[in-house]
């Protein structure tokens, strides 16, 4: 569960390393789960990259420490909270995605993120 003020690692090569959630998009949601879109501010970034520190970006949550229950009764959780930075059309701004992503990302029609990911769990 990703609340406002939660720090997330960035799972792509846009140059941002850490972002902080400042808003969960989609109605009156209190927290974001895997596949939800958030507004975040970049807290750590690499120099000379497209995304700079203190930029406000949109991101899709791809991994959470909180376990989620699937339809078949299986639970899945990850070691970190991670997000992929996207543009207004929900396409990733980076050209690579690092680490595994959950299958729920495919169900939410983020097929470009799924195709860039090395592993889908």
Swiss-Prot record:
MF annotations from Gene Ontology: large ribosomal subunit rRNA binding; structural constituent of ribosome
Listed GO CC annotations: chloroplast; mitochondrial large ribosomal subunit
Location within or outside the cell: Plastid, Chloroplast
Matching SMART domains: Ribosomal_L14
One Pfam family matching this protein: Ribosomal_L14
InterPro entries given in the database record: Ribosomal_uL14 (IPR000218), Ribosomal_uL14_bac-type (IPR005745), Ribosomal_uL14_CS (IPR019972), Ribosomal_uL14_sf (IPR036853)
Xref: PROSITE patterns: RIBOSOMAL_L14 (PS00049)
Keyword line: Chloroplast, Plastid, Ribonucleoprotein, Ribosomal protein, RNA-binding, rRNA-binding
Major site of localization recorded for this protein: plastid
GO terms of biological process kind: translation
Biological role: Binds to 23S rRNA.
HAMAP family named in the record: Ribosomal_uL14
Subunit structure, interactors included: Part of the 50S ribosomal subunit.
Family: Belongs to the universal ribosomal protein uL14 family.
Protein name listed in UniProt: Large ribosomal subunit protein uL14c
Biological source species: Phaeodactylum tricornutum (strain CCAP 1055/1)
